Amino acid sequence: MQKIASSQETILYRLGSPCYKNRFYILTGPGSRELLARPEVVGFPCYSALLEETVAALRYLSSTGMGGDLDILTILRGGLNYPLEEACALAGIRVRDMHFLSCERIIRDHVITGLDIRYEKLRPTSGRVLAIGDIIASGATLRKCLD
C-alpha cells in the first residue's frame, strides 16, 4: 500500500501488486475513521461523514487523469450508504451508469457465516472506470460481492 496523496487528515492510498490488473485505492479520513470507531452510526450521518473526503479524493484522481466518465457500483447494506454518486457530481465527474448489489449477512449462532446476494444489477461497460464506494473494515463483504 502506497500513500499517494494527503490533505489535512485525509489520506489516499493505492494498493499495488503485480497480480492486480486493476487499480485499487483506499481512502481514509476523519469521517471514515469515525465510522470504524462508532459502527452504530447509520443513515444520513454515515453518508455525510464520508462526503467531503470522497470529493477531495475524486478531485485529486481527476486532476491526475483518472476523471472522465465512470460507472458506479453501490453495495447496498442496510443503513450503510456510500456517497459516491453525489461526490462525483460535486467533483465534476460524469456518472454514466449505476450498478447495484444488495446483500445480507448470513448469521448462525451469532457468527457471520456467509453472504446472501439478494438483488443484482451489474452490467459494467468495457473500457470504463468502475468506481466502488464501500465502507470496508476487513474487506470480506466486498470480496464476496465481487466473486
Predicted regions and their residues:
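PRPP-associated nucleotide enzymes
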Residues: 1-147
